[in-house]
């Protein structure tokens, strides 16, 4: 069986419960120092709620890098074309120390960036507690950008949405090329199944034909059961 790459795009739509969204994102992104393929990678936040939501995230444990700190991260992120192994799976405070910042309280690092350069490394799976943060004009732009990003890396995997709009959820289901949409839940603890949703619990998530997978659901024991189909005329 083939399983696709994770690169989870999280959309915060303007009707979202911001306290729930902020708590869930920090909980999800900091879990196991963001080594899960279902860990939040990019946050797309609507302009109308952007400043307010960044403040909520900061209150929950986000450290948003300034331009000088972003340049320092850019300089140490790669070694010989690959992610610096000294940073992978390390907690936020350790990464910040390497940027000259002493902060033991932060759980997640935010890298604010525009959507003009989608080839930038922060738009890809990173395996450390750093999130790309992007301001979008509206929910339609968010869906278009989310699809563009997942089609570059993470096609067919998953997308997270924080919203109270059933209309937007339905639209996302029609527009997104992903096998699962995780609604109002900590993504890394939910995409692989949890007590709070009906998904089968697994570490192997199918990505469908989008991601060149054999399955588009969570791998389960039933996938290994042989079945005999009795066919009568």
Please state what every model-predicted region is:
Residues 1-117:
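ALDH superfamily catalytic-core signature
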Residues 101-233:
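Conserved C-terminal structural/oligomerization subdomain of aldehyde/semialdehyde dehydrogenase
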């Amino acid at each position: 069986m083939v399983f696709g790459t994770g690169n989870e795009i999280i959309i915060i739509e303007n009707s979202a419960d911001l306290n729930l969204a902020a708590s869930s994102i920090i909980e999800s992104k900091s879990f196991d120092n963001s080594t899960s393929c279902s860990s939040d990678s990019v946050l797309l936040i609507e302009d109308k709620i952007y400043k307010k939501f960044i403040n909520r995230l900061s209150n929950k444990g986000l450290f948003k890098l300034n331009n000088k700190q972003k340049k320092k991260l850019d300089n140490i992120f790669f070694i010989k074309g690959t992610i610096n192994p000294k940073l992978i799976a390390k907690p936020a405070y350790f990464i910040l120390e390497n940027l000259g910042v002493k902060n033991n309280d932060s759980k997640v690092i935010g890298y604010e960036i525009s959507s003009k350069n989608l080839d930038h490394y922060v738009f890809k799976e990173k395996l450390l507690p750093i999130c790309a943060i992007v301001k979008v004009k509206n929910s339609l732009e968010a869906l278009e950008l989310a699809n563009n990003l997942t089609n570059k890396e993470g096609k067919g995997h998953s997308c997270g949405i924080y919203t109270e709009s059933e209309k937007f959820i339905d639209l996302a289901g029609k527009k997104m090329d992903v096998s699962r949409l995780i609604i109002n839940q900590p993504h890394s603890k939910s995409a692989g199944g949890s007590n709070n949703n009906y998904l089968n619990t697994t570490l192997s998530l199918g990505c469908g034909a989008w991601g060149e997978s054999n399955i588009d659901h969570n791998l389960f024991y039933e996938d290994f059961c042989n079945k005999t189909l009795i066919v009568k005329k």
